[in-house]
């Protein structure tokens, strides 16, 4: 539902996602964990220094919370992690633009994620309406972003994820930096922190 200028997803289209086949999701999660934990996948395909599972992330080609099955998918993951004795051991993350946090079904998914010891990475690249349009390709609503961020932080540990870069050779202005800090400042005590990164 966003179209960020730095997005690398090919043929990105707006609109809702296809339905999630929860039975298939469960089979695929079980199959992968079986191979990764008990099979030869790590030895066969992963360099020795990287042979560990880091997380299970809800992210990718679009906004994960836009799937009506999001909360059920988190519950499915919880059951699979329990069977593999990975609950509380393998980090669970949601990487989101936060635009749908007002929906009760999304909040249920966030609550379930928190019960797994998971966390949310909540995207805020800019905090001025015009800059949000320019960078994220959606109407800029800083007040709504702040409200949704607060909702998210109420349900689960929440990191703000920010991509900061020059556009056409022009770095974000002092006004833009101040707007960003002013948006986050009232919530600083409720957030896990900020992941600040640039373009590779």
Where are these regions (language model features)?
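Conserved Radical SAM active-site core
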Residues: 9-116
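Short cysteine clusters
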Residues: 4-7
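Conserved AdoMet/S-adenosylmethionine-binding subsite of the radical SAM
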Residues: 66-199
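Residues immediately within or flanking Cys/His clusters that coordinate Zn2+
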Residues: 1
């Amino acid at each position: 539902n966003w179209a960020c200028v730095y997005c690398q997803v090919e043929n990105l289209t707006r609109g809702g996602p296809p339905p999630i086949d929860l039975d298939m999701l469960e089979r695929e999660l079980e199959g992968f964990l079986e191979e990764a934990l008990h099979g030869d996948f790590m030895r066969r395909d992963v360099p020795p220094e990287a042979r560990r599972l880091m997380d299970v992330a809800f992210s990718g080609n679009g906004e994960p919370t836009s799937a009506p099955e999001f909360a059920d998918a988190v519950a499915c993951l919880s059951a699979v992690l329990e069977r593999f004795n990975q609950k509380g051991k393998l980090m669970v993350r949601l990487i989101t633009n936060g635009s749908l946090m007002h929906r009760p079904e999304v909040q249920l998914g966030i609550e379930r994620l928190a019960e797994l010891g998971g966390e949310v990475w909540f995207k805020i690249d800019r905090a001025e309406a015009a800059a949000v349009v320019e960078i994220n390709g959606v109407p800029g609503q800083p007040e709504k972003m702040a409200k949704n961020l607060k909702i998210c932080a109420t349900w689960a540990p929440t990191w703000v994820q920010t991509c900061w870069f020059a556009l056409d050779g022009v770095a974000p202005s002092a006004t833009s930096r101040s707007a960003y800090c002013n948006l986050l400042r009232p919530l600083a005590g409720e957030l896990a922190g900020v992941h600040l990164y640039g373009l590779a």
